[in-house]
A protein has these predicted regions:
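N-terminal regions immediately upstream of nucleotidyltransferase
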Residues: 1-75, 87-91, 121, 136-139, ...
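Conserved catalytic core of two-metal-ion nucleotidyltransferases
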Residues: 47, 95-146, 333, 339-358
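Hydrophobic, small-residue-rich alpha-helical packing segments that form membrane-like cores
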Residues: 71-72, 76, 80-85, 132-166
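Short, hydrophobic beta-strand segments
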Residues: 78-85, 304-313, 357-362
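Short, polar/flexible loop-turn hinges at active-site or ligand-entry regions and domain interfaces
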Residues: 86-90, 107-108, 162-166, 187
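Short amphipathic alpha-helices in soluble, non-transmembrane regions
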Residues: 94-100, 372-377
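Conserved nucleotidyltransferase catalytic core and NTase-mimicking acidic/glycine-rich helix/loop elements
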Residues: 167-353, 365-370
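Extended, charged low-complexity segments
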Residues: 346-463
Length: 463
């Protein structure tokens, strides 16, 4: 059905009005901007002063969304990089960088990306700010990185030169808020969505949030964006966005097929039926146990749950290994003739200690005590004799081949996983956690916590 010019203009007006109203809600006010700037400058000054006191050759700079003025109000995660000369050894970078970072904060925790950094907490102007203090090498050329984080200052410079004062900062905020409301903002393993830097590049490419959505609504698998036209990356991902400062890198490598598809669908929905609701973060409401039981009964499937204490590693490593374990366990289940419909992983923080959980939904979860074992063709005499020597009669013949019926070792999925889970390829940290103890049960027999309810809300598509 064709849309008249009048209707198109009316729709465009509504879209612009909604976006302008949302911008007013999510743009940091003057007070918030002044606080973030003051705190950032204070930390940088303290770091530089401490570096002199401690005899450390390093200086601090501000990077990320607060440096580029693209953060959403109330979401100011401050990133400060501590720049060391390129000739610094990896050991000195780690030891001196962490010592310097710890010296400016009373409350912090050590985290790990490509190398350790400090996640600090600062009380400032009656609120608490979270700040990442990241040691890196001050490389002169992004093609000569010594660690993955070394390219971030180049990202900073690239975006600031093209975004600052352009008026596009608010368009970036709109995109971030939109993605956040669909649970696909952030490149960490838990989400596998769109990073802040990727959002900035997409707006630089399309010049407005609405223009971006109109293009995204038409995306196909393998969509390729190369702002500088110098890309050398040849991977196979749903979305490829060449890094302007590193032509061999895909900025969108972390974006999963789900996140890619979710964005396309959300873009089409918003453009067709624009509403403020697309920008409203909703408090996640977990499914109750009774709701879950009703839905599960209607589906007619069975759910098996594997639970164990979550390894104490950074979230990205944890979820990467959980997904690896999920794939391996799923293969074990299917090798034993059970049929997996869907599966997923989560971490339940609604317990005394964080629990890692793998969930498997099954179409076939119980099997007969016997199974058919197909042998060689009767005409292959040498192989046939070996087969008959190895197995016990009776020998059946079907379609010209010998067949024997053998006793199935596991007739239900729970007994299989209780006995064979450790044989799976689980990843270093998950394997160690499994060794310390795990629980396998049907979902109806397990503890139904808030965390489980939140997982199934998303699993069933009710988010």
């Amino acid at each position: 059905m064709s849309v008249s010019v009048t209707e198109a203009k009316a729709k465009s007006k509504v879209l612009n009005e909604i976006c302008n109203e949302v911008i007013e809600q999510i743009r940091p006010g003057a007070k918030e901007q002044a606080e973030v700037k003051a705190l950032t400058e204070l930390i940088i000054t303290n770091l530089n002063s401490k570096a002199v006191e401690m005899g450390i050759d390093a200086h601090a700079i501000s990077v990320g969304s607060t440096a580029r003025n693209t953060w959403v109000s109330g979401e100011a995660d401050i990133d400060i990089f501590i720049m060391f000369p390129v000739e610094t050894s990896d050991q000195d970078l780690k030891e001196k960088g962490l010592a310097l970072a710890k010296s400016v904060s009373d409350r912090y925790e050590e985290r790990y990306a490509s190398h350790p950094y400090i996640h600090a907490y600062f009380r400032f102007a009656d609120r608490e700010y979270e700040v990442d203090l990241v040691p890196c090498f001050a490389v002169k050329d992004p093609s000569r990185l010594k660690s993955a984080v070394d390219r971030t200052p180049f990202h900073n410079e690239y975006v600031i030169q093209r975004l600052s004062g352009s008026g596009l900062e608010d368009e970036v905020r709109l995109l971030k808020q939109f993605l956040r409301c669909f649970g696909i903002y952030g490149s960490e393993q838990r989400r596998k969505g769109f990073s802040g830097y990727l959002c900035e590049l997409l707006i630089l490419k399309y010049q407005s949030f609405i223009s971006f959505l109109k293009h995204a609504a038409e995306w196909r698998y393998g969509e390729r964006i190369d702002i500088e036209g110098h890309g050398k990356y040849r991977g196979d991902e749903p979305l490829i966005v060449i890094d302007p400062v590193d032509p061999k890198r895909n900025v969108a490598a972390a974006v999963s097929l789900y996140s890619f598809s979710r964005l396309i669908d959300a873009a089409r929905e918003f453009l067709a039926r624009p509403s403020h609701d697309f920008f409203q973060l909703k408090e996640p409401k977990p499914l109750s146990e009774s709701e879950f039981r009703r839905i599960a009964k209607e589906r007619g499937t069975a759910f098996v749950v594997v639970r164990f204490k979550a390894p104490e590693v950074v979230e990205d490593i944890l979820f990467s290994q959980l997904r690896k374990a999920e794939i391996s366990v799923r293969r074990l289940i299917e090798r034993n003739d059970f049929v997996v419909y869907r599966s997923g992983v989560t971490v339940d923080a609604d317990t005394d200690t964080d629990e890692a959980i793998m969930v498997f939904e099954l179409l076939v979860w119980q099997l007969p005590a016997i199974k058919k074992h197909i042998g060689p063709p009767v005409t292959a005499r040498r192989h046939a004799e070996k087969f008959k020597n190895k197995h016990s009669p009776p020998f059946l013949i079907e379609d010209g081949r010998y067949v024997v019926e053998v006793k199935r070792r596991y007739t239900d999925v729970v007994s299989l996983l209780k006995n064979e889970l450790k044989s799976c390829s689980l990843g270093k940290h998950v394997s160690k956690a499994i060794e310390e103890g795990y629980e396998v049960s049907w979902i109806v027999e397990t503890r139904f916590s808030t965390g489980i309810g939140l997982f199934f809300r998303d699993y069933f598509g009710y988010s």
